[in-house]
Amino acid sequence: MAIADWPAHERPREKLLTQGPAALSDAELLAIFLRVGMPGKSAVDLARELLAHFGSLGRLCHASRREFSAIHGMGPAKYAQLHALLEVARRALKEEIAYGQTLESPQSVKDFLRLTLGHRPQEVFACLFLDVRHRLIAWEELFQGTLTEARVYPREIAKRALHHNASALILSHNHPTGHVEPSESDLVLTRELCRALALLDVRVLDHMIVGRAEVYSFLEHGKM
């Protein structure tokens, strides 16, 4: 049955307008994005199939163009729409960080990092460079590595901090395995970077490890 034939209160779009987006399932939200289904399948049916194929909404959103387009009916136009939506979300979170003091909105920082790094297949080390009031100056992905490791060069981080005239920064890297507990090497690296940057009068405010579903903050766990 087409969604247009459903009772009004069950249709995803009407449900969102009357009850808010939190009331919708992943499949219902995705159906609004898809707009239409296929012969014999409603948009909700198609959304459920996509979620089952990729395993989760996060994996679907971060599928490669080749993986996404391999699904019948999901061509380059839908892929472009999806990634435009993701980029809008990233930029909105980045603006929220930029216009407020970063430490006053740690959840915004976590959301931005999770959306940006959480589903990357290789380890990426990145920095948020901040001014004296802890507002965002720049975001840079500095090093990329393998599934388990990205080689980090403290001198390069120091050079970028000086380039941006940063007074502080937040370190971040993802764990593609999804486990966010810091390793011993993560702890050692953080201490080394704190010492090296302190010589330049640049303060490391936090180091965040990003997984698919959560973000670990060194500051919140008393490790800074």
Swiss-Prot record:
Motif, JAMM motif: chain positions: 173-186
Keywords per UniProt: Hydrolase, Metal-binding, Metalloprotease, Protease, Zinc
Query: Which family does the similarity line name?
Result: Belongs to the UPF0758 family.
> Does the keyword Heme feature in the UniProt annotation?
no
InterPro entries to which the protein is assigned, alphabetical: MPN, RadC_JAB, RuvA_2-like, UPF0758, UPF0758_N
- A molecular function GO annotation: metallopeptidase activity
Q: Which GO terms describe its biological process?
A: proteolysis
Spell out the protein name for this chain: UPF0758 protein RSc2444
Q: Which residues form the MPN domain?
A: 102-224
Residues that coordinate or bind Zn(2+)? H173, H175, D186
Q: Which Pfam families match?
A: RadC (PF04002), UPF0758_N (PF20582)
Q: Which PROSITE patterns match?
A: MPN (PS50249)
